[in-house]
Every structure is written in structure tokens, then in C-alpha cells.
């Protein structure tokens, strides 16, 4: 049996929320996020392309949410993604995760 947290292959949050972050996290400003995958939303903030729309889906998300999804830039992901807690980690439920999962007909974690 795998000890892998289900969040690692879910991706529902990546196709539910706008992923915005401080502009300097992009690689053209010294950060690690590929700037070509972002769009500017204010003088000081960017977001991942695809997430600033009515039905968001991060451009870095590969696969199908809830089934076989993965982040193609996981090691270089934004602080927003790094700070989004995996549901169930250390026994703590992430209600935002459960809202995203509900959109895809997935059970809460």
C-alpha cells in the first residue's frame, strides 16, 4: 500500500483556484517559476496562466484532476502552491481542498 498523500495525484486545487503570487517569484525576476507560464495581474502580482478565468486550470497541471494529475513544475511551484496544505497531512483537513474536490465529484479527504 502506498503512503503517498492522495493530493500528490489529485490536482483538483490546480483546476479550481486562481494561483497568484508576488511577481518576483518568476524566473525573469530572479525566482524559479517559468515566466512564460504566468500572466501579470497587477504591478506586483502574477498568476499561473489559465487560473485567472471563470473555470481555472493551471497551465502546469498535467492529467485529469482526481485521477492522474501532476504538476509539471512541482520543484519550481509558487509560494501559493507550497503553502496550500495537503489535506490530511498531520491529521489536519484542508476545507479548501475539499471544496475543489467536490467540483470534480470527489470525496473529501
From Swiss-Prot:
Top-level division of the source organism's lineage: Bacteria
Keyword set, alphabetical order: Electron transport, Iron, Iron-sulfur, Metal-binding, Transport
InterPro entries: Puta_zinc/iron-chelating_dom
Pfam families attached to this UniProt entry: CxxCxxCC
GO molecular function, one term: metal ion binding
Record flagged with keyword Transport: yes
Family: To A.calcoaceticus putative ferredoxin.
Protein name: Uncharacterized protein YkgJ
Gene: ykgJ
